[in-house]
Amino acid sequence: MIFVYALLALVITFVLVPVLIPTLKRMKFGQSIREEGPQSHMKKTGTPTMGGLTFLLSIVITSLVAIIFVDQANPIILLLFVTIGFGLIGFIDDYIIVVKKNNQGLTSKQKFLAQIGIAIIFFVLSNVFHLVNFSTSIHIPFTNVAIPLSFAYVIFIVFWQVGFSNAVNLTDGLDGLATALSIIGFTMYAIMSFVLGETAIGIFCIIMLFALLGFLPYNINPAKVFMGDTGSLALGGIFATISIMLNQELSLIFIGLVFVIETLSVMLQVASFKLTGKRIFKMSPIHHHFELIGWSEWKVVTVFWAVGLISGLIGLWIGVH
């Protein structure tokens, strides 16, 4: 059945994207490009966004099929809740930007409050209503040490889900970058899940992986469609949730290393400018810095993919030992 889920997720996305692109163009749901960014990005202006709807719909449909046939499907139900929750936040943000022509979208406060709400509901469903059972301790790799947090673990969940949701969102600035890194990440977590005996989570990772494989041909340079916040916020939230449910939280630092680096580059840039009035990078997130020093977009993307693959393998090794 795993092959069926994979094929279904792949086909649904691959078929939906070319159907959605003309609709998005007709409705003028196009991406706005920052004027201070690399000049090579100006040609991307108007490229349809909100393409994440396609793979999210594929994930929802395929997961609902899987829930029918998979024993102990509660992990899939919970992951589906997180997918829809963070995806809905991203969709509303995209809608305000492209339909209401308000480049700010949701305010930072509105977005954070909504993300925190999803994270708290996830904790309640899992640890209060026991939809799934996972430890409320953070396990230190290569040791038998676990830091017990009990109900304070909800604070960690909020930090982890909100942090990685926004980290993937920051990374989604170059054609195919966030999509391919996510494919690498879900491949690692699929393997890890099956090795650890978490079959339902592994099946969900396979669904994620193949839904994104169906999207990648349309998102790779030159991109015909962008995933938008609809897709990126959901992907980051799912990554964090999977690492939590596997009790392998810290593996995500390596599996999602590029997302972490991109986020740190923004934080360092803002802190440096506020404290000294000077910028560390020509532009943040850091992928734009490399473009502005002369790297082609394709070079930046392929180097970041390579980093993601190597660090992902390290994260997998950490997770299964």
Residue positions per predicted region:
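Alpha-helical transmembrane segments
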Residues: 1-23, 55-88, 122, 126-127, ...
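Membrane-interface helix-loop junction between the first two transmembrane segments
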Residues: 19-37
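Peri-membrane helix termini and adjoining interfacial loops of integral membrane proteins
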Residues: 28-34, 90, 94, 130-138, ...
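Juxtamembrane helix-capping/reentrant segments at transmembrane boundaries
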Residues: 34-48, 101-115, 286-288, 292
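Short aromatic-rich membrane-water interface segments that cap or initiate transmembrane helices
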Residues: 45-47, 140-152, 294
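Membrane-interface helix termini and inter-helical loops of multi-pass transporters
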Residues: 71, 99, 130-145
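Hydrophobic alpha-helical hairpins/lids featuring a short glycine-rich hinge
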Residues: 72, 76-107, 111-113
